[in-house]
Amino acid sequence: MPRSTKKGPFFDHHLIKKVESAAGSKRPIKTCSRRSVILPQMVGHTIAIHNGKNYHPVVINENMVGHKLGEFSITRVFKGHCGDKKSGK
């Protein structure tokens, strides 16, 4: 079920403070808050999202508003299925 509209979008307040303080800066903003919703104030900023191991820099554009930060930094790596072992013999 989607979140109630009367509650509004969820975002971590410390992330918004970082975005507002880095208004003219080109350095990426590091965050572990994958659960925060992208707000219009974040458009144009580069946010480095933690995936559990590394930080992945993501440039925020207008199409991303309303989505969560975690959607743009995958946490699992798919190595592919094993090939057919019989064909090598």
UniProtKB/Swiss-Prot annotation:
Q: Name one GO cellular component term.
A: cytoplasm
List, in alphabetical order, the GO biological process terms annotated in this UniProt record. ribosomal small subunit assembly; translation
PROSITE patterns in the record, alphabetically? RIBOSOMAL_S19
Q: What Pfam families does this protein map onto?
A: Ribosomal_S19
Q: Where is the signal peptide?
A: none
Q: Which GO terms describe its molecular function?
A: rRNA binding; structural constituent of ribosome
InterPro entries of this UniProt entry?
A: Ribosomal_uS19, Ribosomal_uS19_bac-type, Ribosomal_uS19_CS, Ribosomal_uS19_SF
Keywords from the UniProt entry: Ribonucleoprotein, Ribosomal protein, RNA-binding, rRNA-binding
The entry's family comment says: Belongs to the universal ribosomal protein uS19 family.
Give the protein's biological function.
Protein S19 forms a complex with S13 that binds strongly to the 16S ribosomal RNA.
What's the protein name? Small ribosomal subunit protein uS19
Origin organism of this chain?
A: Xylella fastidiosa (strain Temecula1 / ATCC 700964)
The gene behind this protein is rpsS
